[in-house]
Amino acid sequence: MRVSQFFLSTLKEAPAEAELASHRLMLRAGLIKRLGSGLYTWMPLGLRILHKIEHIIREEMNSSGALELLMPAVHPAELWQESGRWDVFGPQMLKIQDRHQHDFCFGPTHEEVIVDIARREIKSYRQLPINFYQIQTKFRDEIRPRFGVMRAREFIMKDAYSFHADLGSLEQTYQLMHETYSRIFTRIGLKFRAVAADTGAIGGSGSHEFHVLADSGEDAIAFCPDSDYAANIELAEAISHGILRKDPAGVMKKIATPDRKSCSDVAEFLSVPIEQTLKTLAVIADGRFYLLLLRGDHQLNETKTRKIPFLSNFEFADESRIIAKTGCLPGYLGPIGVKTEIIADRAVLEMSNFVCGANEEGYHLTQVNFERDLPLPVQVFDIRNVVTGDPSPDGKGMLEICRGIEVGHIFQLRTKYSEKMKATYLDESGQTQILEMGCYGIGVSRIVAAAIEQNCDERGIIFPVAIAPFQLSIIPIGYHKNLQIQAEVEKLYRACRAAGIEVLLDDREERPGVMFADQELIGIPHRIVIGERNLRDGMVEYQGRLDKTSRLLSLQEVIPVIREICGG
């Protein structure tokens, strides 16, 4: 491809609203153009990248035995009402009416549609297992679209749905999809981790997320560098350090702590480590008042807490309800002398000589100890986020925390949708059984942004070769002024194309600095620079975008060298 025949639309500066590096660079490189809030046009350069990702996904999904189909983007309300999600999915669902006032939605996901297909078409166990997938546009009305295509309202997704006669078959396909996803992200060239995850609103039992590792990631991931353990921080179990409580170091004292409400402020004021303070949170569930106890440096994990049956719908108590129940302001709450149910995190049981609220405004208690000043909590659960240095749940080392961008998610849905929508089959004995179901999603358009977050520098994007818009760029210096340069450039350009190398020739009548800046911005990983001085010796300069290497090659070496470093 010649730049003169291509649409290259780069910007020197990104719009002010672009927060993430990927958003800024995608706009500057002309990969996307904003149409409206959370709505983007994929320009020719960006679409080449998107198509390459889709091609890799299709190859691996087809290789796994999955069958591609394409379902409608617009769904009749009746299907969603049947599953019970029409009223509970929330405002993210874009609901519309046709000219006959019939209700529809623009599909945020396709479980209902695929289950409708399955119940119509799957009659016998002989048709199972089967796995359908599509690459389709979806719409979710995000309250605050941001970060470009990372959290857009309209996005492209690969979603697959498998149907099975029994749980064993589902688990086999689930493992197959886990392996398939790992191959997909490896081929794309991403550094990623598969992590155990919460099933969330989709529901079901087993669940894993696939995260591209990036400092800008919204999700926190706990992993063990000495093993394969990795989990979303919402799900990672906090294992006890096995610390024995110390003997009391002194009598309990009430200390004035004026205007010190947070654990960090109290710790600083009293010159004690924050882990020696006790955090007391007030919550209400089903009309009952509870105090949650955590170590001062630990954060409440709401996902874990909601898995405690009697706290499944808890909400934080506001100041007025706290005062009405305890007579004390938030910030000075503590577990001593209160007549309310107490729920403690496991780590709290290892505390001794700690600081807690005195249930009196402006005061805290110091040198507090269990079994002397208050009884040990009876109701103890894992309700905190893990932190770096916690023991790994698999017993093989210590946890570390990193950030990740979720690009894939797989679920064992079991019968969550098939039972509600009466999707059944006849087993070997002729008995009617409910279909077991799996669900497997990849954020196709999101992968582009995630890859950029992981592969960029101050000059622009550095795409992995597998998804780069072009494998090689040719920058001729003096192309329009030197006939010899022009002839050699054209010869090399034709040879690259004949060899199957995806090449972009910058044949514009521009200053070299402009051409270099554009090529570095748009993310082409390899570059050949042809100038008069080197050409006299039959040489050209190769420049690697990723490793910033530079070396001279003879004209005859260019094709074999580029083919080798591009993997073929």
From Swiss-Prot:
Cell location: Cytoplasm
SUPFAM superfamilies per the UniProt record, alphabetical: Class II aaRS ABD-related, Class II aaRS and biotin synthetases, YbaK/ProRS associated domain
Catalytic activity: tRNA(Pro) + L-proline + ATP = L-prolyl-tRNA(Pro) + AMP + diphosphate
One Pfam family cited in the UniProt record for this chain: HGTP_anticodon
Keyword Nuclease: no
GO molecular function terms attached to this record: aminoacyl-tRNA deacylase activity; ATP binding; proline-tRNA ligase activity
Entry similarity comment: Belongs to the class-II aminoacyl-tRNA synthetase family. ProS type 1 subfamily.
Name of the molecule in the record: Proline--tRNA ligase
Species the sequence originates in: Nitrosomonas eutropha (strain DSM 101675 / C91 / Nm57)
Encoding gene (name): proS
